[in-house]
Amino acid sequence: MHTLGMHVRRIREAAGITLEELARRSGLSFRGVVYIEHGKRNPSLTTLLNLARGLDIEPSRLLEVFDAARREPIESPKSDPE
């Protein structure tokens, strides 16, 4: 599954931006950026816009991934046949 955090990380690394630099540019905490990249935090719309600013990209590049992830069906646990 392609997550928003993975997308943020790819863009950040391709741009040669460190985690610390992205945090500073976007006004987020270092830990907050790490949590987003590792899928441990679901960012708000405001945070997505701040990340886009920090990455110097159009917000739509992040919003597309965010929207696609939101529409993915949630898998239910498979039960063991008895």
Regions found by a protein language model. Name each.
Residues R10, A14, G54-I57, A68:
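Conserved amphipathic alpha-helical interaction elements at protein-protein interfaces in regulatory
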Residues G27-R41:
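Recognition helix of helix-turn-helix/homeodomain-like DNA-binding domains
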Residues G27, T46-R61:
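DNA major-groove recognition helix of helix-turn-helix/homeodomain DNA-binding modules
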Residues M6-R25, N50, P77:
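Short basic helix-loop element that most often maps to the first helix and adjoining turn
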Residues Y35, G39, N50, A68:
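Alpha-helical DNA-recognition elements
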Residues L63-E82:
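Short, charged recognition helix plus adjacent turn
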Residues V8, L22-A23, V33-I36, L62:
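Conserved hydrophobic/aromatic packing and binding residues within compact polymer-binding modules
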